[in-house]
Amino acid sequence: MEDGQPYRALTSQEARLASWLLAHGNPDALGYVGQLERAQVTAWKCPCGCASINFKVEDRPEAPPGVHTLADFQFVHEGNLCGVFIYSSDGILSGMEVWGISGDAPPVLPEPENLSPLESTEL
């Protein structure tokens, strides 16, 4: 990140989307709102070029490998069906992932108003 820093603050769009996902996710998702308020984005970048991000929560260790989905929604980007989910690992808020369902994973995060509940991904 800037000046060699390994973490940066969430952008307003990232924070808004993550907050919305936690508010509309699984029953345990709301329990992660406090962690989101202390989260930063790591320097990790997905090699595919998508907009996925990883979190580092202040006063918590790095989240171990693993995915516990807290919220999972779908949206359309440039005519392709895509998905976005926020997840934790071992009780630590870990990241937000975008993925392609009917095409490539999008290089941008969706706006919450464009999300709908994830339907079956079978084509």
Spans of model-derived segments:
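Short, compact, well-ordered microdomains
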Residues: 75-123
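N-terminal domain-onset segments
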Residues: 1-72, 108-123
